[in-house]
């Protein structure tokens, strides 16, 4: 994992946004983005992994503009924009769009693999399990 002042800033935002959130397995949600970040190379990818759900889950408190003002570079902002699944957009259209950005693609692939790991979810499959597997196959092929 890459360590820098920007990564520290991303960690602080991640923790502030998700500190009270719990994942479907009952674990603190912050474990999930930290796990994804350990699989990334380079500052931009690590920051993107750490922040990948902040806008989608806590858009009432965080925005791309606020993250830009905080000093995150365009590569991170672009990937986060693509990783934020807009309401009403079919899931595979969303996946096809984000696949064009190498950082967004790597983060989403790690995210999907972690979200389909039933060991971390107390043996339960997510509702969208089959769709997630379809997205994994697509992202592995592009």
How would you label these PLM feature ranges?
Residues 1-142:
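Active-site helical microenvironments for divalent-metal-assisted chemistry
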